[in-house]
Regions:
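Short catalytic/ligand-binding loop motif for oxyanion handling, primarily in non-cytosolic enzymes
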Residues: 58, 87-90, 128-130, 164
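Residue-level detector of intrinsically disordered/flexible regions characterized by low predicted structural confidence
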Residues: 78, 89, 97-99
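Long, contiguous hydrophobic alpha-helical segments, chiefly transmembrane helices and signal peptides
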Residues: 83, 87, 156-158
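Amide-donor transfer/coupling interface in amidating biosynthetic enzymes
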Residues: 2-24, 34, 45, 97-176
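Flexible gly/pro-rich beta->alpha loop and the following alpha-helix that scaffold active-site loops
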Residues: 22-80, 85, 92
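Short amphipathic alpha-helical surface micro-motifs
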Residues: 12-13, 89-91
Length: 176
């Protein structure tokens, strides 16, 4: 299957994501941010799209943002990673908060059923559960929303392409 990637990275290709998708037996097509992104994805024969993380500050007016029209593309399946999740939630009107970035990258997150996943995260902006009571995360780390579903989209505040548990999570999403 051909998988689309919207590369929001400031510098370079999302090589970890590309390699992880290819290891799962799929080919990739990478595009950059565009003012016409929703139209491009709508017209594309590709049905599964990943949106990368980024080192941009999502709260900056010059940073690329997720277009809310993407959530109306019912025949497309979207997977937004880290920065992309922050941008989507911010543009949907949810509250974000800053925290100091840490050098620690591997964390265990917990789903409502108690399942633990080993994940890689590197963000300093996040959506606090306590400030967004309408959101129902499917996994969390302390007060941070780590995984959430909205319409046609799964969003992770972590990078699934960086751990075995994350790659399994990606595989399951692609197969369902």
């Amino acid at each position: 299957m051909l998988i689309g990637i919207v590369n929001l990275n400031r510098f370079g290709e999302p090589t970890h994501l590309i390699h992880s998708i290819e290891k799962l037996g799929h080919n990739t097509h990478v595009i950059g941010p565009s003012d016409h992104l929703t139209s491009i994805i709508k017209k594309s024969p590709i049905n599964h799209w990943f949106f990368t993380g980024s080192s941009y500050d999502v709260l900056s007016p010059i940073s690329p943002q997720i277009d809310l029209g993407l959530f109306e593309l019912k025949d497309k399946h979207l997977f937004m990673i880290c920065y992309s999740m922050e941008s989507a939630l911010y543009n949907l009107g949810y509250k974000l908060q800053k925290k100091p970035r840490t050098n620690r990258r591997l964390f265990d997150i917990v789903s409502p059923d108690g399942t633990r996943l080993r994940v890689w995260k590197s963000h300093d902006t996040y959506a606090p559960i306590s400030m967004n009571p309408r959101l129902k995360p499917s996994s969390r780390y302390n007060d941070e929303i780590m995984t959430i579903t909205y319409k046609n989209t799964i969003m992770t505040q972590w990078h699934p392409e960086r751990t075995t548990d994350g790659i399994v999570f990606m595989r399951d999403w692609l197969e369902n």
